[in-house]
Structures are given as C-alpha cells and as structure tokens.
Amino acid sequence: MATERTLAILKPDCVRKEKVGEVLRRIQDAGFQLCAMKMITMSKAEAEGFYAVHEDKPFFDDLTDFMSSGPCVPVVLEKENAIADFRELIGATDPDEAAEGTIRSDFAGSIQENIVHGSDSPSNGQKEAGYFFPEHEIVANT
C-alpha cells in the first residue's frame, strides 16, 4: 500500500485547551510521521479560502470566524492509509457521535469546536497540505 499524505489542523480550541502536545503524541503513537508543522493564526480571508468548499453552507461564517479566532497548528502527516486511519483516530465530526477513545470523543466540546481537522481524501490531503506548506517545507520520511 502506498504512503498517503494528509493534513491535520489542531484547531484554536485545541490550542486554548493546551492539548496540542497530547494530540500530537497520540498522532505519532498511531504511526503517523510528522512532515511539516507550524503554529499560525489564520486571517478570516485565509480561513475562507481553506474552507471555500463549504461557502454555501449555513455554518460557513461561524466556522471561518472560529478558525480565525486564535492560533492553530497545521501539520502534514504521512503514513500508509493515512486518510482513513487519521479519520478513525480523530473520530466523528460530532464528538457526541465519536467512538470512545478517539481524539474528538476525549477532547472536543462541539461539532464546530472539535479539536482537529483531517483531510477527507488523498487528493484533498495533497491540496490542503499545499495551502499551508510549499513542497520544499515538507520533509518526507523515507
């Protein structure tokens, strides 16, 4: 099976709750390689650009307000079957529906403030990683 790339964003609620280290430890313990990482505060326009796929949805403004409300940590991850494995690790978008022991079940407070973003497909993983990191900043693990 080929190595896949996915993008995680440890959201502003993760940073506010001081859970960044614990979430990263869980990600690494699950076998993911960290290939790029930085702490940023997205502008409203940057959040709108990243989440443009949702611009027609009723939650778009609240989502982009939240994502630009404070620091977040985008992280490029690689692993075989990265997309599916990461989505399993983080759990359902709604923490009340997330399986016990998942990151969202353990740390998230709501559907919006759900600790972490994860890419939903290999093509989106590549595209989303490129939104935050030029290719020369991504250190592929061999």
From Swiss-Prot:
Pfam families: NDK. GO terms for biological process: CTP biosynthetic process; GTP biosynthetic process; UTP biosynthetic process. Its main location: cytoplasm. Its cofactor is Mg(2+). SUPFAM superfamilies: Nucleoside diphosphate kinase, NDK (SSF54919). Transmembrane segments: none annotated. Keywords: ATP-binding, Cytoplasm, Kinase, Magnesium, Metal-binding, Nucleotide metabolism, Nucleotide-binding, Phosphoprotein, Transferase. Disulfide bonds: none annotated. PANTHER family: NUCLEOSIDE DIPHOSPHATE KINASE, NUCLEOSIDE DIPHOSPHATE KINASE DDB_G0292928-RELATED. Belongs to the NDK family. Major role in the synthesis of nucleoside triphosphates other than ATP. The ATP gamma phosphate is transferred to the NDP beta phosphate via a ping-pong mechanism, using a phosphorylated active-site intermediate. Homotetramer. HAMAP family: NDP_kinase. NCBIfam families: PRK00668.1 (NF001908). This is Nucleoside diphosphate kinase. It comes from Salinibacter ruber (strain DSM 13855 / M31). The lineage of its organism: Bacteria, Pseudomonadati, Rhodothermota, Rhodothermia, Rhodothermales.
